[in-house]
C-alpha cells in the first residue's frame, strides 16, 4: 500500500511539471488602442468626473426681421409691455448688425404736427434701444407722416395699424 501511495504521488507530481498549452488567439475581440474612441474611453476611465464642454448655439435667425410697435393717437411716449420687452430682447440677442427705426403716422394729409409725432416716436424707440445696450452706431432713424400704410381704412380701427414705429433688425 505504501508503494501504491508513492506511485500515485510520483504520477501527480509528474503531471504538474509539464507546462500548460498557450491559448489560441482568434482576433475576434480585438480593440484598436490608438483609435479616437479608445482614447476617449481611456480618458473617461482616468478622469471620470471631468465635465465635458457642450457647445451652445443660437437658433438660426432670418437675415431680416421687422417688429411694429403701435401707439395711440398723438402719443409719443414708449411704455413697452412685458410681452413687448421679451419680444424685443429675444430679437436683440445675439447683437444684430444693424437696426432701422421708422416712425410712421396715420393721416393722408400730413400737417406739420404729424411729422413731429413720427420723429419723436422714432426717437423714443431709439433711446429705449440705447438704454438696452445697443450701440448708437448700429441704429438708423427715419420718420415719415405719410408712408408705408399697413391699412388704407379711413376709419379708426384701420388707422390704428398706421400709428406705429417699425423696428427692422438686420443680421447680415
UniProtKB/Swiss-Prot annotation:
Keywords for this protein: Cell outer membrane, Lipoprotein, Membrane, Palmitate, Signal, Virulence
Localization, UniProt: Cell outer membrane
Main location: membrane
Ranges that cross the membrane: none
Sites of N-palmitoyl cysteine lipidation: 16
Signal peptide (UniProt feature, chain positions): 1-15
Membrane topology: Lipid-anchor
Note: Transcription of the operon is maximal in early exponential phase.
Protein name: Type IV secretion system putative outer membrane lipoprotein BRA0058/BS1330_II0058
Protein species of origin: Brucella suis biovar 1 (strain 1330)
Amino acid at each position: 500500500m505504501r508503494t501504491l501511495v508513492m506511485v500515485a504521488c510520483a504520477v501527480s507530481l509528474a503531471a504538474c511539471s509539464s507546462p500548460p498549452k498557450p491559448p489560441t488567439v482568434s482576433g475576434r475581440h480585438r480593440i484598436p488602442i490608438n483609435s479616437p474612441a479608445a482614447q476617449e474611453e481611456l480618458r473617461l476611465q482616468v478622469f471620470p468626473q471631468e465635465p465635458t464642454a457642450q457647445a451652445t448655439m443660437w437658433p438660426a435667425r432670418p437675415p431680416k426681421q421687422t417688429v411694429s410697435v403701435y401707439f395711440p393717437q398723438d402719443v409719443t411716449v414708449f411704455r413697452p409691455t412685458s410681452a413687448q420687452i421679451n419680444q424685443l430682447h429675444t430679437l436683440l440677442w445675439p447683437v444684430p448688425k444693424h437696426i432701422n427705426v421708422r416712425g410712421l403716422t396715420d393721416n393722408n394729409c400730413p400737417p406739420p404736427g404729424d411729422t413731429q409725432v413720427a420723429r419723436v416716436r422714432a426717437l423714443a424707440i431709439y433711446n429705449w434701444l440705447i438704454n438696452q445696450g445697443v450701440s448708437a452706431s448700429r441704429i438708423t432713424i427715419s420718420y415719415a407722416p405719410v408712408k408705408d400704410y399697413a391699412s388704407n381704412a379711413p376709419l379708426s380701427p384701420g388707422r390704428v395699424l398706421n400709428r406705429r414705429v417699425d423696428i427692422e433688425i438686420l443680421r447680415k
